[in-house]
């Protein structure tokens, strides 16, 4: 739209009138400015230039853009050349999701170039090994309908449409986070969904960043949705200097950061969540285990509320739109353990932070989120005030993947894991009950067995569940 070609999306049609949601500042737009259609829904370009880079909520690069992103820029710079190595030859048959080439950048892990969904046929020609731009045609397919199609290393995909898979598979093993309280007490399965609600100052952002740094996924997609600029600045400053504890390589080689701070347009904040999950699905389709960290889904819900209010829609509970629940379902249900179109097992796990006002877990966003997640990691203000981090309350949190993961641990040398977990939780629950009594009569007045229970529970809390995110010896264990 306009001379700057601002990016927008049609969200309502009323006869000859269209309501357009603009993803950028509209200062300078005036009646009579030209509008041109793209012919497609809001889409992003998925290709080899994603890993190790930083983008805004519309997947526009933030590196080399100065203090603010230039208006009208709607996709990454395509002038970068990438080392291209073909995996097929003329006459080979390719179907959707199959790899036809590999790109090995010096600053990122190897990535495969995939045939886009909905495309299949025989290879008519393919470029030799060399360096090409991600939008240069490198392969031509003769399609079954008699036509031909040029394929490049990258391809566009609409962010609100889930990418197809061959089959959704049952979960098998855990996503190891490096946090003892999560991995031992409330584990998340690969391809699972987790929520992390907590009030102000309970450590949501630090815990999200810690999971992004140390979890054992192949690729991390971190999206700061509506977060404060100084917090995102800390992420952008710290991540490039960190090393992956498993490989020793720079952590950014397996990371995509999407920064959409609170001073960016509200419409772009609403789109950033879908952009992030689409990027995650793209790497999942390459056979990788992907973890998506969304901080915070409450800011995303607030963006939905603001856009809904401007459209004059009837508000639901808390002023949020009536379709808030279905939008959350659309997002969380894209997490799965799948068999890709290429025939590989892969997963996309989603961990969403929730910021309920006044730490009220009965508010609409938290309430609806609990319906779609299998892990609920409740952050407690009392534990945070006591400087007990991670401030996850062991009696308010839960995981629904315990039964499946018990089988995993039985096969990997610890058949008593579920029993030990129940004993841990039982001790902590009894500690909470006995501490109320001890505050009245004093610890010394309790029977020896109850004093022993309090001592054991204190040892569990202090030596096992407590973990410092800033200690080199303790931040990942």
Which role does the model predict for each range below?
Residues 1, 13-14, 21-26, 39-40, ...:
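A structural micro-motif recognizing beta-strand termini
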Residues 1-64, 68-70:
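N-terminal accessory targeting/assembly segments
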Residues 2, 40-41, 59, 99, ...:
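Short, surface-exposed secondary-structure boundary micro-motifs
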Residues 7-9, 22, 37-41, 112, ...:
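Short beta-alpha junctions and helix-cap segments that line functional grooves
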Residues 16-18, 40, 119-123, 183, ...:
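Metallocofactor- and cofactor-centric catalytic cores in central/energy metabolism, strongly enriched
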Residues 64-105, 109-116, 123, 133-193, ...:
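P-loop NTPase nucleotide-binding/switch module
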Residues 184-185, 191-477:
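P-loop NTPase catalytic core
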């Amino acid at each position: 739209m306009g001379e700057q070609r601002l990016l927008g999306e049609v969200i309502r049609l009323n006869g000859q009138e269209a309501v357009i949601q603009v993803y950028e500042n509209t200062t300078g737009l005036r009646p009579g400015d030209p509008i041109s259609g793209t012919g497609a829904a809001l889409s992003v370009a998925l290709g080899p230039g994603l890993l190790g880079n930083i983008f805004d909520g519309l997947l526009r690069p933030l590196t080399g853009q100065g203090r603010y992103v230039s208006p009208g820029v709607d996709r990454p710079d395509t002038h970068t050349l990438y080392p291209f190595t073909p995996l097929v030859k003329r006459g080979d048959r390719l179907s959707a999701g199959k790899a036809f080439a590999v790109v090995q950048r010096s600053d990122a892990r190897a990535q495969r170039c995939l045939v886009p969904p909905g495309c299949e046929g025989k290879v008519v020609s393919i470029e030799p090994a060399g360096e090409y731009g991600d939008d240069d045609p490198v392969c031509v397919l003769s399609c079954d309908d008699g036509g031909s199609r040029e394929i490049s290393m990258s391809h566009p995909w609409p962010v609100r449409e889930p990418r197809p898979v061959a089959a959704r598979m049952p979960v098998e093993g855990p996503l190891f986070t490096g946090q003892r309280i999560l991995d031992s007490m409330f584990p998340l399965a690969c391809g699972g969904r987790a929520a992390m609600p907590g009030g102000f100052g309970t450590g949501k952002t630090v815990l999200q960043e810690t999971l992004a740094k140390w979890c054992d996924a192949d690729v991390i997609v971190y999206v700061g949705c509506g977060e404060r600029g100084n917090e995102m600045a800390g992420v952008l400053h710290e991540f490039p200097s960190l090393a992956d504890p498993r490989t020793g390589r720079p952590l950014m080689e397996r990371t995509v950061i999407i920064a959409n701070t609170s001073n960016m347009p509200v419409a772009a904040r609403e789109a950033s969540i879908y952009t992030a999950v689409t990027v995650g699905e793209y790497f999942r389709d390459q056979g990788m285990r992907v973890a998506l960290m969304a901080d915070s889904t409450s800011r995303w819900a607030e963006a939905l509320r603001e856009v809904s209010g401007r459209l004059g829609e009837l508000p639901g509970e808390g002023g949020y739109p009536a379709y808030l629940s279905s939008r959350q379902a659309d997002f969380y249900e894209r997490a799965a353990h799948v068999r890709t179109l290429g025939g590989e097992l892969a997963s996309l796990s989603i961990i969403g932070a929730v910021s309920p006002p006044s730490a009220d877990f009965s508010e609409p966003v938290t309430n609806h989120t609990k319906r779609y997640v299998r892990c609920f990691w409740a952050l407690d203000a009392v534990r945070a005030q006591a400087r007990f981090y991670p401030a996850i309350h062991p009696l308010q949190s839960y995981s629904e993947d315990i039964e499946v993961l018990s089988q995993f641990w039985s096969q990997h040398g610890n058949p008593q894991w579920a029993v030990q977990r129940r004993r841990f939780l039982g001790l902590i629950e009894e500690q909470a009950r006995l501490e109320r009594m001890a505050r009245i009569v004093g610890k010394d007045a309790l029977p020896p067995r109850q004093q022993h229970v309090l001592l054991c529970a204190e040892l569990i809390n202090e030596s096992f569940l407590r973990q410092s995110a800033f200690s080199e010896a303790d931040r990942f264990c």
